[in-house]
Amino acid sequence: METGSPGKRPVLPKRARLLVTAGMGMLALLLFGPRLVDIYVDWLWFGEVGFRSVWITVLLTRLAIVAAVALVVAGIVLAALLLAYRSRPFFVPDEPQRDPVAPLRSAVMRRPRLFGWGIAVTLGVVCGLIASFDWVKVQLFVHGGTFGIVDPEFGYDIGFFVFDLPFYRSVLNWLFVAVVLAFLASLLTHYLFGGLRLTTGRGMLTQAARVQLAVFAGAVVLLKAVAYWLDRYELLSSGRKEPTFTGAGYTDIHAELPAKLVLVAIAVLCAVSFFTAIFLRDLRIPAMAAALLVLSAILVGGLWPLLMEQFSVRPNAADVERPYIQRNIEATREAYRIGGDWVQYRSYPGIGTKQPRDVPVDVTTIAKVRLLDPHILSRTFTQQQQLKNFFSFAEILDIDRYRIDGELQDYIVGVRELSPKSLTGNQTDWINKHIVYTHGNGFVAAPANRVNAAARDAENISDSNSGYPIYAVSDIASLGSGRQVIPVEQPRVYYGEVIAQADPDYAIVGGAPGSAPREYDTDTSKYTYTGAGGVSIGNWFNRTVFATKFAQHKFLFSREIGSESKVLIHRDPKERVQRVAPWLTTDDNPYPVVVNGRIVWIVDAYTTLDTYPYAQRSSLEGPVTSPTGIVRQGKQVSYVRNSVKATVDAYDGTVTLFQFDRDDPVLRTWMRAFPGTVKSEDQIPDELRAHFRYPEDLFEVQRSLLAKYHVDEPREFFTTNAFWSVPSDPTNDANATQPPFYVLVGDQQSAQPSFRLASAMVGYNREFLSAYISAHSDPANYGKLTVLELPTDTLTQGPQQIQNSMISDTRVASERTLLERSNRIHYGNLLSLPIADGGVLYVEPLYTERISTSPSSSTFPQLSRVLVSVREPRTEGGVRVGYAPTLAESLDQVFGPGTGRVATAPGGDAASAPPPGAGGPAPPQAVPPPRTTQPPAAPPRGPDVPPATVAELRETLADLRAVLDRLEKAIDAAETPGG
């Protein structure tokens, strides 16, 4: 066998070389072409939105990581290969029948450089590409600062654990990978070239092979010693005691922590024993040291903590874990901002002591009670305000508030977006889908506390023109008319949640000056986009790039695309924010608002950490279902701040990031990493700030934690006796928890309307009400949490019990049977409202939807009844149930005649007006009169009109209305043929 000279190598013909070269070029193009196209498109898109610096910073960071890791891994592996190759035996017996690696050895000897460099570079590049995903850790390490808070065990600033430690661990992991790969490369190379030979009954190892393998093995063990040292700090995020609490417990501090130090010492001794193999031929010392390390890891690192936990800690857990539970409580409250000045606790009896009309706060609260449910009314909005088949609203509408004529009112709001999935027939042609149908039209709102008329006749509810929202529409048709309740100067919507559902998601807009418009605007007009958004495809190179990206040749050949054309991509507001700020976690629910005459999407964004010492882990995102159907828990965090409010302009797609938490050290770190990307809080316009809502995702995390972390005493925390639970949703059969709800309630100090996100809480493994949590959204008190704590022995019913009490009421049960003959019933939000100076009022709208008799007919929900319930002013825990077509009448039933009418006069009259007569469904109202959305003025309450007189007058008026209803029914019956 020839080992030194490769001999004469065969030469390929010129044509064959050309074919091989062309084939390799095509393969490279197929492998890397799409990625290069994506990189160029990202370059263009980030430049369009003004965040190219973010793209460049992330790219350079990842390239630097690739280069660093690739150099380290490739260098160490190449050095190992080179040493093993140069120290190979000079003579290796060439016996293929006894040496199975002889053919491979011959092949390697022909191209030793390709063998060495090829393996080293390949491993280095692969490791570098994988390591590049750790760019976040690198940026946090480089730009991280301090928190000003030290951990209670080591006395280090929290910044060390969240900014530095993850980086150190990442570096250590890649050094591990490099050294292990070098060890394996050395082992295989020595085996290939005869430095290591395995024969029957024994093996042979040359001195060079022994030294090299011992050095790399010692390096691995030495790195393991460093890992044990870092493990000490990571104990502060230990999950041993979960779900009771997160963080180091008694066993971690008194067994695991000393064990790590012992293992550090043993690992160092073991590494030294491996290094002695450089001078000693006997490998038994390193072998015994390795066995000692493994045995110590099992006994000291595993068995000792296990025995301590089982026989010392668990029998006395309430006492021995007390200081560590206290650490967990303090850290969790700080990490999630559920302690200190951010949370106000108040004792609350749960039983009303006054009439609502005697409490100014209650007058405001009941007047603003929300009857429209954004989860139910999307189809109603779509059917009545759709205008065209290709327009639609989001599956779940949103809730916001607007001050109209000086009065604050909450609205159900939605954007009339283009729905790509609703295009049919020729509308799905490429030109129509991407060039003609490009945008939505208008902002639609409806006062949340009223409908157009009360639905009184249970037998003919579906045929009545009642129970529908009173729409305030701001669209193209109403533009410039002066009749818009919420003025919008640019109602066209090119960016939104629904429009982004196109597959693929892009629209081609723009045209040369003076060219004929092509985009559908209204039935009588077309439009040409003039916004700043979009990537230019006016040159042939960009057109070719996008034709490649979307695999669509029409980018190249369509005459509809000209020199001024642009392509709009990434049209989902949430996606746009995620792309320009990949270091933020976005809320699942962007919502539209009107600011300065423009429709913009507000996206709540969070800074998060997952290594905050002692802080409880929680899931900021809901369960995620994989394509294979496996349900996994969402992103786990141990620190969260709603530090950024982002906006996306619905017309031109402009993304703006605003700082919203000056005290967040994580946001300050990211602002140093990406300077100029986040505007300071001082630059937030007041009109925009007035529409900020407390985000639902954050509130859901906080309420689930407050269920436990309202407890101050560690022993009581351990017993769980004082814990609360998030109630199950009584209107959902899927065993889901009750979602929080936005409400406009009276402020305790001023009695003025205050916009809040709220939730009821029940006892642990009980259904009785235990607490009521609300988060302020008003600018002056934004982020403050108010917790009303009920007595532990309360008999005030929780949401599930109240739901059962209401639907089992004889009036409800009997009429429900009647309604279900021709309707489907939908129960809306079950709202819990503090009222009557200590009581809790439950309000639940009941919607009916006519059962469709044919596949082509469309049906949609309408408000038909309002259920209310309040606890009896006694200690037994009984409840009163109100059930009527209007909130006012339902309140009369539980508080006495006239009470509901007086208390809800600002918002109740419009909802309780008698129906104007039988008729079909309410026709779409493109531009309603501006006054229809205003709450009617409250009745005068001067000294010359006693409350009793007002109540009597209203009761008499209600009787007259009932007589009129009976008279109308009699007239209708007389006019019906055969009647």
UniProtKB/Swiss-Prot annotation:
Residues 898-948 are annotated as: Disordered. Residues 902-912 have a biased composition (Low complexity). Residues 913-946 have a biased composition (Pro residues). One of its GO terms (cellular component) is extracellular region. The keyword Manganese does not apply. Keywords: Cell membrane, Membrane, Transmembrane, Transmembrane helix. It comes from the Bacteria. Its main location: membrane. InterPro entries: UPF0182. The chain crosses the membrane at residues 19-41, 63-85, 114-136, 174-196, 208-230, 261-280, 285-307. It is a multi-pass membrane protein. The keyword Membrane applies. It is found in: Cell membrane. Belongs to the UPF0182 family. NCBIfam families: PRK00068.1, PRK12438.1. This is UPF0182 protein Mb0065.
